[in-house]
Amino acid sequence: MWFKQISFYPLNKEKLPEADVLADKLAEAEFTHCQGLDWFSEGFTAPVSFSPELVFPADFTLRVALKKEEKVLPAGVIRDILEEKVAEIQNNEARNVGRKEKQELKEQITDDLLPRAFTRSSRTEAVFNTRHGYLLVNNAASAKAENILTKLREALGGLEASLPNTKQSPSSLMTGWLLQGHCEGGFELDSDCELKGTGDIVPVVKVSKQDLTADEVVQHVKNGKTVTRLGLVWREQIAFILTQDFTLKRIQYLDVLQEEAESNGDDAAGLAFASQILMAESVSTMLEELVSYLGGWQD
């Protein structure tokens, strides 16, 4: 239930859907399995295992999930069958098979195999935080995050969401914090970072499980490298990697949050309810503090 990586989008809090409206709209775009000659199928599915509902509400949060099912048809399988058919035609009819005919044969083979192909599925989850006005997506890959945002917009007929563009870049802030040897506010340096230089061949330095205030680490910044990833700890509650794209990776929710969730959840539903609220509130509060050190949002 706890997101391990996050992309997020600021939302217009005045135009967020109610839980029942969101559920009705998502029902019109519900997931169905791949049929016949379809290569993939995509739609909304239940975000929790103990309920068939398409929206899991918890106080000021709404959880949704997008499922994608894809046919798995290895190119090598198609190629082998095609070669067999081409050889059969050449032997039986004593003629060559041209490029156009090979393409037609390939399409016929694909159409024949698709209905019987294996499938693989994946899902992307997101939580609406209606109190803070954020959409938190459980994926740091921009393509995956933007895809669920697009599907939500299509289902709702629009959703006012923007990219998290701040006045100062995350890379600039991270570089400054590493250079000065400490962070601001509730943030502390952890033990991992990545730095990049400039030039035709960009040098990359990865630091893992080391003291980030050590001279040999700081010297990379003094030599002109910028920080692209930085391990941080926020108020002894969350440890994470901040990236230059303003995504969060390798998120760890420390004991204080885990214990609070467990104390408020007597069963699977109760634990999911408490965990969702605590995750959304702590992450959103942390993001707001981080945004303040980044100079606020761009106009």
From Swiss-Prot:
Q: Can you cite a GO biological process for this protein?
A: DNA recombination
Q: Does the keyword Cytoplasm apply?
A: yes
What range does the record give for the signal peptide? none
Chief place of localization: cytoplasm
Location comes to: Cytoplasm, Nucleoid
UniProt key word Cytoplasm: yes
Question: What are the annotated GO cellular component locations?
Answer: cytoplasm; nucleoid
Q: Which domain of life is it from?
A: Bacteria
Q: Which InterPro entries match?
A: RdgC
Q: Which UniProt keywords apply?
A: Cytoplasm, DNA recombination
Q: What happens when the gene is disrupted?
A: Mutations affect pilin antigenic variation; some mutations create growth defects.
**Pfam families per the UniProt record, alphabetical:** RdgC
Which family does the entry's similarity section mention? Belongs to the RdgC family.
Q: What does this protein do?
A: May be involved in recombination.
Protein name in the entry: Recombination-associated protein RdgC
The species this protein belongs to is: Neisseria gonorrhoeae (strain ATCC 700825 / FA 1090)
The gene name on file is rdgC
